[in-house]
Curated annotation (Swiss-Prot):
One of its GO terms (cellular component) is GroEL-GroES complex. InterPro entries: Chaperonin_Cpn60_CS, Cpn60/GroEL, Cpn60/GroEL/TCP-1, GroEL-like_apical_dom_sf, GROEL-like_equatorial_sf, TCP-1-like_intermed_sf. Each subunit is composed of an apical domain, an intermediate domain and an equatorial domain. The apical domain is sufficient for substrate recognition. Contains a characteristic histidine-rich C terminus which is essential for copper binding. Copper binding causes conformational rearrangement. Forms a cylinder of 14 subunits composed of two heptameric rings stacked back-to-back. Also exists as lower oligomers, including monomeric, dimeric and heptameric forms. The switch between the single-ring (heptameric) and double-ring (tetradecameric) forms is mediated by phosphorylation on Ser-393. Interacts with the co-chaperonin GroES. PANTHER family: 60 KDA HEAT SHOCK PROTEIN, MITOCHONDRIAL. CDD domains: GroEL (cd03344). Pfam families: Cpn60_TCP1. ATP binds at T29, L30, G31, P32, D86, G87, T88, T89, T90, G413, D495. This is Chaperonin GroEL 1. It comes from Mycobacterium tuberculosis (strain ATCC 25618 / H37Rv). The modification Phosphoserine is found at S393.
Length: 539
């Protein structure tokens, strides 16, 4: 296929146009008074959302050079979402501000490499300053505050706070759609672990990139599964039940994995394969935990069990299994509450007996997963469109709450980027020379962008608000809900540090990439045929 090539300033400017189109669409969603974006769908009704990454994912531009710029900035939103689960709009706005400020300087003859180095050092300094100023979060109230800020809804905040405080730091909070109008919280037997599907072809929910299995059977296997003749007899028995299958093994590879993928594509058997977490004896022990929760048996060749000879009786079950690319959640496993309680008792006894701190910590993790169960937030709404929007809000709130528990919180509303972050940059600037200093200056200017748009979306003059907040003491800023200035943490306006740090680091990464781009190569678009001259002037 023939290519189009652009160089230097022309290439960077074309990418900037695309980047602006994406960022200008996403930025209207920022803040408690952020606006909605309506997304038309090829099938079904439109989606109404104020979730930045959902908007970003929908955007594809006609001009290939512009689209390249849009896709680069989109990667900032998706990466921030993957790491922190929230903060996608902040990341997009920061990236736009950094790139625009940087491109102005590059056009004026500043060395883009030195500029990029300065931006990188600034991002690291801001990240460290935010971590250093973080306040730890614990307890139902603290978690609920974070979730309320993320979802803009106190009821959602309270539900997430209750869920997280019940299942604990390592526990699992799952979000499901409900057929009722209200949103409610349930606690069930279940377990989660940090391993995802082995092939993207297993995905059933394309919006969330998840494989969702309802009323599933579960095969737990201690070793690798690669031979199709070994797996096929059991697959045929499972197909006869009409139920989906989750396979957890040391690995699933070769023709066994290929067959599962082909079945998934043809929709003949819904099955998902994941690797078991951990290694060696720890993996074996965790598979036994899974067996207790799901009511199944671990197929163990060492104990004389042969995969091709086992029947449905060794399979566990669950009401629902949700698998993403990074983790697996089993909800309402088929094991009895008594068996789970006995297993937890056994783990507690092992913890008491162990002399090793490391062993105790790892056993404690397993106990938390086993005993914590799964909190299920069932989201309901009056219409399909409202349901999707509310479910997105709850998912963001859960992600923000987990991030806050992990690394703590800082004052929200864009204020921590003005106060703590800019203070760190003033100290850094004094230690740099040459064009690297300009990189720090660009970064310092860009840090005001999130606050500017939070204020602008609330109908205020962004520049006036930025100047006012800059003069206030650290931790003070604009509470957009009340349109008043004050102590943000006391007002419950807070952000998880992990979310803000991820936004800063990902924005700086893509900005350095764009600023040092000298040539852009894209596929030449296929020309649409011009039909006009075929149709007559005979009327």
């Amino acid at each position: 296929m023939s290519k189009l090539i652009e160089y230097d300033e022309t290439a960077r400017r074309a990418m900037e146009v695309g980047m602006d189109k994406l960022a200008d669409t996403v930025r209207v969603t920022l803040g408690p008074r952020g606006r909605h974006v309506v997304l038309a769908k090829a099938f079904g009704g439109p989606t109404v959302t104020n979730d930045g990454v959902t908007v970003a994912r929908e955007i594809e531009l006609e001009d290939p050079f512009e689209d390249l710029g849009a896709q680069l900035v989109k990667s900032v939103a998706t990466k921030t979402n993957d790491v922190a689960g929230d903060g996608t709009t902040t990341a997009t706005i920061l990236a736009q501000a950094l790139i625009k400020g940087g491109l102005r300087l590059v056009a004026a003859g500043v060395n883009p490499i030195a500029l990029g180095v300065g931006i990188g050092k600034a991002a690291d300094a801001v990240s460290e300053a935010l971590l250093a100023s973080a306040t730890p979060v614990s307890g139902k109230t603290g978690i609920a505050q974070v979730a309320t800020v993320s979802s803009r809804d106190e009821q959602i905040g309270d539900l997430v706070g209750e869920a997280m405080s019940k299942v604990g730091h390592d526990g699992v909070v799952s979000v499901e759609e409900s057929s009722t109008l209200g949103t409610e919280l349930e606690f069930t037997e279940g377990i989660g672990f940090d391993k995802g599907f082995l092939s993207a072809y297993f995905v059933t929910d394309f919006d969330n990139q998840q494989a969702v299995l309802e009323d599933a059977l579960i095969l737990l296997h201690q070793d690798k599964i690669s031979s199709l003749p070994d797996l096929l007899p059991l697959l045929e028995k499972v197909a006869g039940t009409g139920k989906p299958l989750l396979i957890v093994a040391e690995d699933v590879e070769g023709e066994a994995l290929a067959t599962l993928v082909v079945n998934a594509i043809r929709k003949t058997l819904k099955a998902v394969a994941v690797k078991g977490p951990y290694f060696g004896d720890r993996r074996k022990a965790f598979l036994e935990d899974l067996a207790v929760v799901t009511g199944g048996q671990v197929v163990n060749p060492d104990a004389g069990m042969v995969l091709r000879e086992v029947g449905l009786e060794v399979l566990g079950s669950a009401r629902r299994v949700v698998v993403s690319k990074d983790d697996t959640v089993i909800v309402d496993g088929g094991g009895t509450a008594e068996a789970v309680a006995n297993r937890a008792k056994h783990l507690r006894a092992e913890i008491d007996k162990s002399d090793s701190d490391w062993d105790r910590e790892k056993l404690g993790e397993r106990l938390a997963k086993l005993a914590g169960g799964v909190a299920v937030i069932k989201v309901g709404a009056a219409t399909e469109t409202a349901l999707k929007e509310r479910k997105e809000s709850v998912e963001d709130a859960v992600a923000a709450a987990k991030a806050a528990v992990e690394e703590g919180i800082v004052p929200g509303g864009g204020a921590s980027l003005i106060h703590q972050a800019r203070k760190a940059l003033t100290e850094l600037r004094a230690s740099l020379t040459g064009d690297e200093v300009l990189g720090v200056d660009v970064f310092s200017e860009a840090l005001a962008a999130p606050l500017f748009w939070i204020a602008a979306n609330a109908g205020l003059d962004g520049s006036v608000v930025v100047n006012k907040v800059s003069e206030l003491p650290a931790g003070h800023g604009l509470n957009v809900n009340t349109l008043s200035y004050g102590d943000l943490a006391a007002d419950g306006v807070i952000d998880p540090v992990k979310v803000t740090r991820s936004a800063v680091l990902n924005a700086s990464s893509v900005a350095r990439m764009v600023l040092t781009t000298e040539t852009v190569v894209v596929d030449k678009p296929a020309k649409a045929e011009d039909h006009d001259h075929h149709h007559g002037h005979a009327h």
